[in-house]
């Protein structure tokens, strides 16, 4: 939480099924980091144990086998993964090819720079079929889809509705 407050990173957590198992602080950070305005955890600091709030809002991606705790799942856009079968042939990531991703990184940064005013002023319609928390979860991605345009606004909203329906089944 101190790192999040100071550097405002994007949090990428792999092996979440083992990492979160007995890590109450991490679950609190994930749960508390859902809303930009109210996202904070309180911790005592210094020799006097003075209570201090730490902001914990940050974009987060959590990869894991299985489902997270209900409170984490309710604050998430869940994309279910499955364990790779022994017969599946997957090309591993080669660190030396990392440089191939830099042009994409630069294009995304440029796109954001060119569109940040539109994104900040966008008040996207979210699918009414979603519950209130799910609507909060998808609002930013709907704004991005609206600014991108084309088929993306409709495609994205339909995908969110289908994900919500699958979760209810």
Map each language-model feature to its residues.
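Short glycine-rich substrate-engagement loop in P-loop NTPases that contacts/grips substrate
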Residues: 1-10, 40-41
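Phosphate-sensing "switch" segment of ASCE/P-loop ATPases
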Residues: 52-56, 65-169
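Conserved catalytic/switch belt of AAA+ P-loop NTPases
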Residues: 25-52
């Amino acid at each position: 939480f101190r790192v999040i407050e100071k550097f405002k990173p994007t949090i990428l957590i792999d092996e979440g099924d083992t990492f979160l198992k007995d890590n109450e602080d991490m679950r609190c950070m994930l749960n508390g980091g859902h809303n930009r305005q109210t996202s904070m955890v309180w911790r005592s600091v210094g020799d006097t144990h003075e209570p201090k709030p730490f902001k914990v809002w940050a974009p987060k991606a959590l990869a894991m086998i299985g489902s997270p705790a209900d409170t984490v799942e309710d604050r998430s856009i869940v994309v279910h993964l499955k364990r790779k079968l022994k017969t599946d042939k997957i090309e591993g990531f080669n660190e030396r090819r990392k440089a191939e991703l830099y042009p994409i990184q630069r294009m995304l940064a440029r796109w954001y720079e060119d569109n940040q005013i539109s994104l900040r002023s966008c008040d996207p319609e979210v699918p009414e079929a979603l519950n209130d928390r799910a609507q909060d979860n998808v609002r930013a991605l709907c704004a991005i889809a609206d600014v991108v345009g084309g088929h993306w606004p409709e495609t994205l909203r339909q995908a969110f509705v289908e994900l919500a329906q699958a979760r209810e089944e």
